[in-house]
Amino acid sequence: ELGPGDRIGVGEKGLMSVEGLLFAKYLMYRAVYWHKGVRAPTAMVKKAVLLALRDGVLEAEELYGLDDAGFFGLLRARARERGFPPFALAEAVLQGQSYPVLLDLPFDGADPRHRALLGLEARLGFEEELAARISARGPALGPLDLIVDIPEPVSFESDGAQAATPAVD
């Protein structure tokens, strides 16, 4: 229906359908995208791409419109051209290998230490610092051996409000 000012709206009869669609979207995120078994491989690929963007190995524009085959083909081509070690993370995911989840903590937005890690650059720096601290006391870890994953908030609201993104067993 058209509302005031030719804005598109949903009438009373369509409200249940829209609510059902939003609830189905939430269930899909909860069951699939937020599941720990999916989060680790997603975080591995994400880290490879973030580092490639940061280091100029990839440009954001190159990633638009790619399907999975095109995306991974681009990463493989750049790995061959430039020998970029972080792309080994994405290749491991393609081979069915995933980092194990060693610690799963709920995100606490009231905790300044958690909020500090929302920025991707800060998170990459924290990962490097944590890997160095662990290496000083135990097994040697490189900067690619550890990933802190904080799922981005996803909006299920029409006004852009953010829904919580819990990890699911």
Where are these regions (language model features)?
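Histidine-centered, transition-metal-coordinating active-site segments
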Residues: 1-169
